[in-house]
C-alpha cells in the first residue's frame, strides 16, 4: 500500500493535527503514507500546486474528496482501496473545494457525506476511514462488525 494525501491549508488547532497524524501513523503499519500540506490560496493557485504534486505521481490512482462524489460504507471502502495495485493519491481542497480540472483528472470522487463539514473534520474523517479500511481489510479488530455484516462479509469472499 502506498498512499499520499494532498491537503490544502494548515489545521489551526493542533489537536486536530495530532489526531490525524495518529491515524496516519497507524495506517503506516500497512505501507507507506505521504502527507503533503499545500498553502491556502486562491483556487487557481491551489489547482496549480495540486497539478505540480500530481506530476510526481503520474501513474497514481487519484481520488478527490467532493460532495458530488460517491458515498461508501466503511466495508465497501475496505474492499475497494486494498484492491488498487498502484499508489493512491487523496486530495482535500481548500474552502472553495477542488478545481474542476483537478476533478477531471481524478479516477473517482469520494463523498464523505451529503453534509458539508469544516476542513478539520473532513481531514480527520479521511485519515480515520483510511486507517479503518486497511485495518478491516487486514483482519484487524478496530472495526466492529455486526452479526449481519459478518454474515454478508463471508458471502462476498
Predicted regions and their residues:
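N-terminal beta1-alpha1 ligand-phosphate binding loop
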Residues: 1-23, 27
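Loop/turn-to-beta-strand initiation segments
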Residues: 2, 85-94
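Conserved RecA-like P-loop NTPase ATPase core
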Residues: 5, 63, 93, 126
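Short glycine-rich anion-binding loops that position phosphate/pyrophosphate groups of nucleotides
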Residues: 11, 67-70, 94-97
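Short glycine-/acidic-enriched loop or helix-start segments at secondary-structure transitions
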Residues: 15-17, 73-75, 99-102, 121
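Short, surface-exposed alpha-helical segments at coil->helix boundaries
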Residues: 17-24, 47, 100-103
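S-adenosyl-L-methionine/SAH cofactor-binding core of RNA-modifying enzymes
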Residues: 30-89
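Structured adenosyl-cofactor binding patch, chiefly the S-adenosyl-L-methionine
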Residues: 100-157
Amino acid at each position: 500500500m502506498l498512499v499520499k494525501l494532498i491537503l490544502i491549508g494548515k489545521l489551526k488547532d493542533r489537536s486536530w493535527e495530532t489526531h490525524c497524524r495518529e491515524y496516519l501513523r497507524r495506517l503506516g503499519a500497512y505501507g507507506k503514507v505521504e502527507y503533503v500540506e499545500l498553502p491556502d490560496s486562491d483556487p487557481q493557485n491551489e489547482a496549480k500546486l495540486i497539478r505540480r504534486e500530481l506530476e510526481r505521481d503520474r501513474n497514481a490512482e487519484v481520488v478527490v474528496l467532493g460532495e458530488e462524489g460517491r458515498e461508501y460504507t466503511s466495508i465497501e471502502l475496505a474492499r475497494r482501496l486494498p484492491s488498487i495495485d498502484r499508489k493512491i493519491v487523496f486530495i482535500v481542497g481548500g474552502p472553495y473545494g477542488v478545481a474542476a480540472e483537478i476533478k477531471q483528472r481524478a479516477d473517482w470522487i469520494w463523498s464523505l457525506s451529503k453534509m458539508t463539514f469544516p476542513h478539520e473534520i473532513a481531514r480527520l474523517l479521511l485519515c480515520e476511514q483510511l486507517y479503518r479500511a486497511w485495518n478491516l481489510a487486514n483482519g484487524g479488530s478496530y472495526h466492529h462488525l455486526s452479526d449481519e455484516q459478518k454474515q454478508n462479509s463471508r458471502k462476498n469472499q
